[in-house]
């Protein structure tokens, strides 16, 4: 994976189903405590957030079930691909998360994993799970929006 010459975000992995399955309430950026072979594997662009989720245990936030495959050139120092990884947040942010999770039926869902200024960051969302009818409404809204754009394009081209 090539480095970003402008120093912006270099996205490694995204959780595409998260925005479909959850209604996002608030976004957080957190650092991730990783081992050397994990960082090398991420630099090659290998990671999956498909089944990942975050939990708060005894005042610490943990990212669970994220898959970072073993580094190809690593030896006995390689890591466990599905190990729990600690997320680095300020105490106030953790306290806010704990309060909001306790109050409502909310979950912490990772949306993307990226490099920012050489450090691995994860974009976390405080989210509420969508019901089936919510997903259908979103799909209908997207279809209607697509149809409006298509119609405007036809009119602009003079097809009607």
Curated annotation (Swiss-Prot):
Cysteines paired by S-S bonds: none
SUPFAM superfamilies noted in UniProt: Small protein B (SmpB) (SSF74982)
Keywords: Cytoplasm, RNA-binding
One term under GO cellular component: cytosol
One function term, GO molecular function aspect: RNA binding
Superkingdom classification of source: Bacteria
Protein name: SsrA-binding protein
Family under the similarity heading: Belongs to the SmpB family.
InterPro entries: SmpB, SsrA-bd_prot, SsrA-bd_prot_CS
Role: Required for rescue of stalled ribosomes mediated by trans-translation. Binds to transfer-messenger RNA (tmRNA), required for stable association of tmRNA with ribosomes. tmRNA and SmpB together mimic tRNA shape, replacing the anticodon stem-loop with SmpB. tmRNA is encoded by the ssrA gene; the 2 termini fold to resemble tRNA(Ala) and it encodes a 'tag peptide', a short internal open reading frame. During trans-translation Ala-aminoacylated tmRNA acts like a tRNA, entering the A-site of stalled ribosomes, displacing the stalled mRNA.
PROSITE patterns, per the entry: SSRP
Pfam families with a match to the protein in the record: SmpB
BP GO annotations: trans-translation
Matches recorded under PANTHER family: SSRA-BINDING PROTEIN, TMRNA-BINDING COMPONENT OF TRANS-TRANSLATION TAGGING COMPLEX
Subcellular compartments: Cytoplasm
Residues of the signal peptide: none
Entries under Gene3D superfamilies matching the protein: 2.40.280.10
CDD domains in the record: SmpB
The encoding gene: smpB
Spans traversing the lipid bilayer: none
């Amino acid at each position: 994976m090539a480095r970003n010459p402008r120093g912006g975000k270099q996205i490694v992995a995204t959780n595409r189903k998260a925005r479909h399955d959850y209604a996002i309430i608030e976004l957080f950026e957190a650092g991730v405590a990783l081992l050397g072979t994990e960082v090398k594997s991420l630099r090659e662009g290998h990671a999956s957030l498909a089944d990942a989720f975050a939990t708060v245990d005894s005042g610490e936030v943990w990212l669970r079930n994220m898959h970072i495959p073993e580094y190809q050139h690593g030896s006995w120092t390689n890591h466990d691909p599905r190990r729990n990884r600690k997320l680095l947040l300020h105490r106030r942010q953790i306290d806010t998360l704990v309060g909001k999770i306790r109050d409502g039926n909310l979950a912490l869902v990772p949306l993307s994993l990226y490099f920012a200024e050489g450090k691995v960051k994860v974009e976390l969302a405080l989210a509420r799970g969508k019901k089936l009818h919510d997903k259908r409404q979103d799909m209908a809204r997207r279809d209607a929006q697509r149809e409006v754009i298509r119609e405007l394009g036809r009119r602009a081209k003079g097809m009607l």
